[in-house]
Amino acid sequence: TGTNYGFAFDIGTTTVAGQLIDLNDRNILGTRIAFNKQAVYGSDVITRIIYASNTAGLDKMNEAVLDNINEIIQDLCSAQKIALSDVYCIVCAGNMTMMHLLLKVDPTNIRKAPYIPTTTVFETIHAPEAGIEINPKAIAAFLPGVTTYVGGDIVSGVIACGLAEGDELSLLIDIGTNGEIVLGNKEWMIGA
């Protein structure tokens, strides 16, 4: 009970979307979408990976997306008259490149054969450790990916639509800058 708020973020190549959620009743209190500020360094993931491999490039990419996240948090909390200290949780999902850049993990291997990311699983940490400006004790969780081209954004879609629990064959399509699809049911899935 009491004031208990959280955020859900979709870190996309083109846009960053955030939702403010009342964690007590699960109501969505607001949504904001902004163009991903990393776009000034390249409009696609390959260009951004190359830029990130340059001196201070990874830091600049990280700062750009953190600016997006913190501005959206500030905007939504201000609109609802919610103190940042009342935000206790943030969950982020994105394609594998976006998650690497958000967490300052070297993304170089994503674009080089055999195309294996540095990691597909990201540690849950306190939000300030990631540069996210909410309650200092708030938890920041990052959805895992499966492989280079099946990131946490697709994993979250599979969870949200219940694809992994259904008997019927279903198709999930993520239409964005980098399109992905998953076909399957509770028995099997294939993604591309």
Label the predicted regions.
Residues 4-6, 140-174:
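Conserved mixed alpha/beta core segments that line enzyme active sites in large multi-domain catalysts
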